[in-house]
């Protein structure tokens, strides 16, 4: 389905611009993208829902129409950015993926006005051991040295996002392959494209969010907002299934749905870096849950 998007922006609490795309008509619904994505990454999902909802696709900081991360960036910052979009749009419906699923849950816990939220494979860590977040120091060093490919490898391995075969390949070989792919994209992408190289610095902040909420599952035990938990059946990062099952036990007002054949990136558009993209399979669940017309 081809739809027209209109660009806009709001100002977050600290003065940072938060850009967004808007399409459709009906009740306002905010779709918040995950790591290594931008608002555009959810264009297919937005298009599929645009006949029932006015869909907003914010760019989280550091990409697209939004301003940069600032020192002290935290989960609270992410919630404040979402709050600015919610206030502008009047939205009471929110969907988040992975780390943004955690942002959505925290927003529902701390902000008034979110009536329903859906979270796809929220990236919640059940303990604060640092096993999935202590890669950031190495990542920052590699990025500062201009070794973008190496930094991405560090992130993929640190988050357990790398395919099984990658885990047995030399880091140098993996980094060279990613560097070559980025150079090709740099040559061929239009000037306004949100390329992998532009996206790479944002990856550290996904770890910041996960680390901040690690071991804090009990925070959501009193959440009264209506929640839909979604996950696919394909294997994702090792911490995703335990987090899903723990939230399924703890959340007091929710239901959970397992979508056969989907993976961690399925809500976003299919691309070279997201071969499992299948927004058409996710949209019907969101439509039913948020109350759109069938």
Which positions does each model-derived feature cover?
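Conserved alpha/beta-hydrolase "acid-adjacent" motif
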Residues: 236-243
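Active-site loop/oxyanion-hole signature of alpha/beta-hydrolase fold enzymes
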Residues: 56-95, 99, 273-280
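Alpha/beta-hydrolase active-site loop signature
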Residues: 36, 60-64, 124, 261-266
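Catalytic active-site module of serine/aspartate enzymes centered on a nucleophile-bearing elbow/loop
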Residues: 253-294
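Conserved hydrolase catalytic core segment
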Residues: 91-130
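Hydrophobic, aromatic-rich cap/lid helix
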Residues: 176-215
């Amino acid at each position: 389905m081809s739809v027209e998007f209109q660009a806009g922006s709001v100002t977050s609490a600290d003065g940072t611009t938060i850009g967004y795309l808007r399409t459709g008509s009906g009740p306002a619904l905010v779709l918040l993208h995950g790591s290594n994505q931008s608002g555009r990454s959810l264009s297919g999902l937005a298009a599929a829902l645009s006949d029932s909802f006015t869909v907003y696709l914010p760019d989280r900081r550091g990409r697209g129409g939004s301003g940069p991360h600032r020192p002290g960036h935290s989960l609270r910052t992410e919630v404040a950015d979402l709050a600015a979009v919610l206030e502008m749009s009047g939205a009471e419906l929110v969907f988040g993926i992975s780390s943004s699923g955690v942002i959505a849950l925290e927003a529902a816990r701390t902000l008034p006005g979110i009536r329903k939220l859906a979270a796809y494979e929220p990236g919640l860590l059940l303990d604060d051991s640092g096993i999935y977040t202590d890669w950031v120091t190495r990542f920052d060093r590699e990025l500062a040295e201009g070794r973008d490919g190496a930094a991405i490898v560090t992130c993929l391995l640190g988050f357990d996002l790398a395919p099984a075969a990658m885990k047995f390949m030399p880091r140098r070989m993996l980094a060279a392959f990613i560097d070559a792919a980025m150079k090709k994209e740099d040559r061929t992408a239009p000037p306004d494209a949100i390329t992998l190289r532009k996206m790479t610095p944002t990856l550290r902040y996904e770890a910041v969010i996960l680390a901040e909420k690690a071991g804090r599952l009990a925070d959501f035990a009193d959440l009264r907002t209506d929640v839909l938990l979604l996950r696919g059946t394909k294997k994702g990062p090792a911490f995703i299934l335990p987090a899903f099952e723990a939230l399924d036990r703890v959340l007091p007002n929710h239901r959970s749905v397992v979508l056969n054949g989907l993976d961690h990136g399925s809500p976003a558009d299919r691309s070279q870096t997201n071969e499992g993209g299948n927004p058409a399979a996710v949209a019907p669940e969101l439509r039913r849950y948020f109350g759109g017309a069938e």
